[in-house]
């Protein structure tokens, strides 16, 4: 059974433009995969704690030596990772905040990137272990920054780092420029959704 994991990060939650685009993709995907499952994670409604020394040490402490608190931290991270492991398709809705991704997404990524779990170090460099998945990323921005912006590069690099290299990024830019620019950008993004699904 095919499974899609939808991750939204907008502070406006379901009303954010990136969330709306991700939801449209998920809905269209569900319509074309009636036997499939859609799981959702809202990082604003349920923010992941920021990585601190105690959490990092929990990840690197050998399993047999972990305290009860450390086991709880690792179990939480394992559950986040398992959602991705079970998914065939990841859909991310990501607005631009201060030229980067929302801090909630960065905190989430910090709990996903685990050596020996989602990636491993090799003599040739790091190797992602979550292979064979597709990611569709909707990035929304108030102005125009282009597809080669560092925000886009970061998202693509992180997904590749954990093994997800089949990545489609859809930008909707100029959303704060004016009504005409916003509708044009969102219309183009919706058209791209129909092509991708």
Model region roles, listed by residue range:
Residues 115, 119, 165-166:
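Short, structured loop/turn "capping" segments at alpha-beta junctions
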Residues 5, 39-41, 136-138, 168-170:
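Hydrophobic/aromatic beta-strand patches that form the interior of the parallel beta-sheet core
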Residues 96-99, 141-143:
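Short glycine-rich anion-binding loops that position phosphate/pyrophosphate groups of nucleotides
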Residues 1-94, 100-110, 114, 191-197:
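N-terminal beta1-alpha1-beta2 submodule of the flavodoxin-like/Rossmannoid cofactor-binding fold
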Residues 13, 47, 144, 176-178:
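Flexible, glycine-rich phosphate/dinucleotide-binding loops
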Residues 121-164:
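Short, glycine-/small-residue-rich phosphate/pyrophosphate-handling segment
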